Structures are given as C-alpha cells and as structure tokens.
Amino acid sequence: MITVKRIDEKDWDAFTVESLFDEIKATKGQTTGQLINGDDVPYIAAAKTNNGFAYMCSAKEHPEWVSNGNTIVFVQLGDGAAGLAHYIPMDFIGMNGKTASGYNAKLSENSGVFIARCLSSNKAIFSHGHSWTGRRLLSTKTMLPINDDGEPDYDYMSKYTQKKRESLLIKYQEYARKRVVDLGENSEIPKMDQKNWDAFLISDIFNICFIFGK
C-alpha cells in the first residue's frame, strides 16, 4: 500500500477557483428534452447524488453539446446541489446555465477527486437565490495541501486519494469474504417460483400522503 503523510501533517493554503483552473467553460447542452438514451456519453446533471450522473445518452444528435472530460464540474444551480463539485474523467454532456467545467493540465483522476471534495465544502454558501456563477464562482476559495513552493501539491493529493481507494478496496474484499463464509460455500438463493407469494395492499407497505396544490 502507498505510504503517504496524514492530512494533518501537511501544510495547507487557500486558493481561488480562478487560480486553480487554466480554463472554466460553460457546459453546452440546451435542453434535456432533446437528449436520447444511448451509450456514448453520460449526462451530468445539476444533482447532489451519484457524482452528478443521471444517465447515458447519445452524442450523435448534438455532438456540439459534448464537453471534454478530465474536468471538475461545478454545479451552479440545482435542487440542493448548488455549490457541489464533481470530478468527471470522461467526455460528457451538461446543461448550459446549470453547470460549468474547470480544466487544469495538472489534474488527474485522483487529484481531481480530492480537489472536488474540497471545493464541495463550500456548498452551504450557495442556493437557488445565491447561485455559483460569475465572480462568486471565480472568487470561491478552498483549502488545499501545498508543496515546498507553496503551490497545490497534486502529487500528494493523488497519492492520498489512491491510498484511500486501496484501503476501501481491502475493506470491501474482507466484507465479501466474510459474507461468503457466513452464507456457506454451497448456499443457494431460491428462485422466484420457489418462494411463497401473497397479495398486500399498497397502504400496508407505504405511508401514503396526499398533497393538494401549492
């Protein structure tokens, strides 16, 4: 496993979004109504779950809507998501006015994940009435670990994230092995037609609320 300093052993400093990225571009999609399901690129929405991933779509109908990957996507507007940042490794489609993408030649997948997480710590500042756009976006500051020259330590951020990935993988593998032992090597899950079935009222399963108007 990679050996890397603890977070609290590193020196940190504040950096603005404007200073971190060589380019910040608006995403190019115009309307989700014209997206067609496919397997070309992901649609990255202004969302707070699944790293913004909504679904896979075709790029053939609107190739001009595709943004380059290896970028950090800024959620500028959205239902509880404004102020979040997502690292996106591959080309994608985002909706203009809702997201923007930042590019930095030094960015890698691991350092991108690290920086996106740090930027997302500003989420509480932004909302529908206080969007993450214009000067508010460019002047947003985030704390990052620095190297001996006082610059963002991309090498450290990459190694730290990789170590976290490896640590989580070990935990998942240990859990999977334990579950196999608990279940027994020859355990079988019954087929659907081998289970007993019965009818239930929807109200027995869900709490149903009726909402009238606004």
Each model region followed by its residue ranges:
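Intrinsically disordered, low-complexity regulatory regions enriched in Ser/Pro/Gly/Thr
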Residues: I36, V66, T133-R135
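General detector of folded, globular domains
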Residues: V17, Y43-I44, V73-Q76, A85-Y87, ...
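Structured beta-strand/turn binding interfaces of compact recognition modules in eukaryotic regulators
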Residues: A47, L77, P145
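A short beta-sheet element
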Residues: Y55-V113, R117
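Sequence-level motif detector for i,i+2 pairs with an aromatic at +2
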Residues: W12, G38-V41, G69, M90, ...
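Non-catalytic DNA-recognition/assembly elements of restriction-modification systems
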Residues: M1-T31, L35-N51, D149-K214
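Short, tandemly repeated low-complexity microdomains enriched for cysteine and small residues
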Residues: M56-A59, S127-T133, S167-K178
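Glycine-anchored helix-breaking recognition loops at helix->coil/strand junctions
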Residues: I88, M95-Y103, I115-N147
